[in-house]
A protein has these predicted regions:
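Central helical "cap/lid" subdomain
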Residues: 108-114
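Core hydrophobic alpha-helical transmembrane segments of single-pass membrane proteins
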Residues: 14-20, 163
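Exported/periplasmic ABC-transporter solute-binding proteins
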Residues: 27-63, 69, 73, 78, ...
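Bacterial N-terminal signal peptides that target proteins for export
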Residues: 2-13
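C-terminal motif of bacterial Sec signal peptides marking the signal peptidase cleavage site
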Residues: 21-26
Length: 273
């Protein structure tokens, strides 16, 4: 065999080896079952009072959407609004009042909102009730130390509305006497609930939905008279610029639908349909 023929033969063998190896690699890839399923993360910003209900819905939504991870961040509605204003990546906003949502709407941060639940403000005291607060009116007379959420948190705004109503019932100055007993401001309703459950405060304003299993045995509820109370309304909206707009709208549909409403009702929210 000439030198030229030898080179040609070697080149042919090398080519056959490459084709064979490539073919094996290709077959091996085919046996892998095709491309892997892509995963996605849906970020929901929700008021603290929604923690239990939305955590349950999170599990249900993930089961309905394999490969999806729902990341739910709970906090005061005012803090969540600030996060959205500062450009935090998120897909859904669920607020404990309409004022925060209206601000988000006016600033073009969210799409059209819908009311999905209502809640009832209440007062809670420790189980042993050391200040002897038996009825709502006692808040103005008792030697008590109160905790309350920070000023812009919806529950505090609702509480202030209730106290303003109480002035007309119990006399001017009642509401201010109650506010004068506040010794600490908490980040959100859950923090306030824990302070009372631990016996670190004599009373606080919460929502009915905040008397959850982890505090129920350690607190008592003092109802606010119906003629003085207000109704907390909860709006929800998808966030403008969401990278998961279709999934975000599906989450909103879940919350507004029968399954979501049943879950919310189980956690002491009032359903809207």
């Amino acid at each position: 065999m000439t030198t030229s023929s030898m080179y040609s033969f070697c080149a042919m063998v090398a080519l056959l080896v490459l084709v064979t190896v490539g073919g094996i690699g290709g077959c091996s890839g085919d046996r892998g079952g095709g491309p892997e399923e892509e995963s996605a993360t849906l970020t929901v910003l929700a008021a603290s009072s929604l923690t239990n209900a939305f955590s349950e819905l999170e599990t249900a939504f993930e089961e309905q959407n394999p490969g999806l991870d729902v990341s739910t961040s709970f906090g005061s509605s005012s803090d969540l609004l600030v996060q959205i204003q500062q450009g935090a990546p998120a897909d859904v906003f669920a607020s404990a009042d309409e004022a925060k949502m209206q601000t988000a709407l006016e600033e073009g941060l969210v799409e059209e909102s819908k009311i999905f639940a209502m809640n009832r403000p209440i007062v809670v005291v420790p189980k042993d009730n050391p200040a002897g607060i038996q009825v709502f009116r006692d808040l103005g007379e008792a030697d008590a130390q109160l905790v309350l959420a920070e000023a812009k948190v919806p529950i505090t705004e609702y509480a202030e509305d209730v106290l303003a109503n109480a002035d007309s019932e119990y006399g001017d100055g009642f509401g201010q006497r109650v506010l004068d007993k506040v010794v600490s401001r908490e980040a959100n309703v859950r923090a306030s609930a824990n302070r009372v459950a631990l016996g670190e405060a004599d009373a606080t304003f919460l929502y009915a939905s905040d008397v959850t299993d982890d505090v129920r045995d350690r607190v008592q509820t003092v109802e606010i008279p119906q003629n003085l109370n207000v109704l907390a309304t909860y709006p929800i909206a998808t966030i403008e610029g969401s990278q998961n707009a279709e999934l975000a709208r599906a989450w909103v549909d879940l919350v507004l639908g029968d399954e979501g409403q049943r879950v919310l009702e189980r956690y002491a929210f009032q359903r809207v349909n």
